[in-house]
Amino acid sequence: MSDTSESGAGLTRFQAEASEKDSSSMMQTLLTVTQNVEVPETLKASKALEVSEDVKVSKASGVSKATEVSKTPEAQEAPATQASSTTQLTDTQVLATENKSVAADTKKQNADPQAVTMPATETKKVSHVADTKVNTKAQETEAAPSQASADEPEPESAAAQSQENQDTRPKVKAKKARKVKHLDGEEDGSSDQSQASGTTGGRRVSKALMASMARRASRGPIAFWARRASRTRLAAWARRALLSLRSPKARRGKARRRAAKLQSSQEPEAPPPRDVALLQGRANDLVKYLLAKDQTKIPIKRSDMLKDIIKEYTDVYPEIIERAGYSLEKVFGIQLKEIDKNDHLYILLSTLEPTDAGILGTTKDSPKLGLLMVLLSIIFMNGNRSSEAVIWEVLRKLGLRPGIHHSLFGDVKKLITDEFVKQKYLDYARVPNSNPPEYEFFWGLRSYYETSKMKVLKFACKVQKKDPKEWAAQYREAMEADLKAAAEAAAEAKARAEIRARMGIGLGSENAAGPCNWDEADIGPWAKARIQAGAEAKAKAQESGSASTGASTSTNNSASASASTSGGFSAGASLTATLTFGLFAGLGGAGASTSGSSGACGFSYK
């Protein structure tokens, strides 16, 4: 019993000394490990205290268990050995941890001082609790000596187990500490730099994550093209460096070649050689085609010319059309005129035979053209438009009614609403929002080129035996239209002359295809009469030497040639004059009566 009491007293003294000597160092060590190793995700004091308390209580319990099983002097030395080894391992681990967490310690200096000092005070409290528990265990050991003696074979195994636990616990602790350091410690340590690196949705980005993102971005397509661009720039720099090492003679030769290439690119390319004879042959065929198509007075489409005559030579069709127009002017005294730039419609205009109406030629359709002059006069005197009701009101006074066949005009309604409209002499359109539908008549595109407002006004005033100036509004409008038409004609003639000079037309190339026998061509009697009239006009102009005399002679000769071509033409001309003046004479006589009324066309009729 006395031995037991002595051993218990010795054990108590040993525990007291160990607790006095090692408690301060162990607590400081544990405090350092707690601060450096077990750093929480955020600096929360409560979590830090819980971790430190668990670690220290486990340490204290391990020490007390070691003292319970040690009865012999060897067992008494075991706690000291265990404590020393544990202290050494802990110190080593602490040093390793301190070396790894230098950045975390430096970043923590700006943290809240209260959050840093709280673990120390709490650790002191835990140390007192651990001492109290150790003393309590010692008293329990004194009270139960029989149990200690009964378990006598176990001390060595227990001591070995405790030693093994003490040896392995720091390693596991260090491994866990490294994991925590990697996962949470760096994030918490870099909290001060999280604002500089940026946050996403409240989540801090660690240095490791930023490094991995940088490595991943360096392998992306953007980085690939950036590296390729840098290599390209490097290659260009190297090429320039190599070029700079060339001899001055080589550099001068390259400069000359570059200048020659630049000059050749700036100079206009020479046009490929053209087969003028072939082009002129196609132009002559086009002249025949135009003369035949114009007999119907329907405008000729450019698409028809390309399809029927020009065919595979579409790349040079402008020159072929221009050569055909030049031949028409020089041989026939006819101008090829494009009246619609959108639909590309062409007509033939006379340049040798001016008449009072200005309408092309003297043909078998002269009576119809006389009726057309009446319609154009009514439309112009009404303000460039006239309703269908007014037109028929005037024609009824002249004995022309819709649906009744006329000996000269046939179906009058079809003539004025279909044939004249197709020939582009008139436009026939419905009045918007009219119920029942009503229609109006306007001048067509062809009428603006074959005649003029001034000629129509003079024609109407001649019938009425009035001066054109008495119709002030119409006279002013006609004068403005004539000035505008003259300016457009001058500009068009200048542009045509430039185009022909560039194409080499009019320099004798029209004879490249050989003489063309127009008399044998299937161009109709009217075209042949125009050829004869043109030839006679040229001969008379050369003989007289005067432009005015030549113009009057060509007019008389063309009229005589047209009359001698066929008896039907002369009869048609006289019929046109009789019809035209007879119609307006009737209108004038009707206007002389007192019971007559003034119509919308400006003429007086019953």
Curated annotation (Swiss-Prot):
Residues bearing the modification Phosphothreonine: T72
GO cellular component: cytosol; nucleolus; nucleoplasm
Basic and acidic residues: compositionally biased ranges: 122-131
InterPro entries on file: MAGE, MAGE_WH1, MAGE_WH2, MHD_dom
Residue ranges of the region described as Disordered: 1-29, 52-204, 248-275, 534-563
Residue spans of biased composition, Polar residues class: 79-100
Domain named MAGE: residues: 279-478
Annotated Low complexity bias: 142-164
Positions of post-translational Phosphoserine modification: S5, S157, S190, S191, S194, S197, S244, S247, S264, S265
List of residues that carry N-acetylserine: S2
Keyword terms: Acetylation, Phosphoprotein, Tumor antigen
Xref: SMART domains: MAGE
Compositionally biased intervals (Basic residues): 171-181, 248-260
Classification via Gene3D superfamilies: MAGE homology domain, winged helix WH1 motif (1.10.10.1200), MAGE homology domain, winged helix WH2 motif (1.10.10.1210)
GO-annotated biological processes: female pregnancy; negative regulation of transcription by RNA polymerase II; renal sodium ion absorption
Role according to the record: Regulates the expression, localization to the plasma membrane and function of the sodium chloride cotransporters SLC12A1 and SLC12A3, two key components of salt reabsorption in the distal renal tubule.
Oligomeric form and interacting partners: Interacts with GNAS.
The protein, known as: Melanoma-associated antigen D2
Native source organism of the sequence: Pongo abelii (Sumatran orangutan)
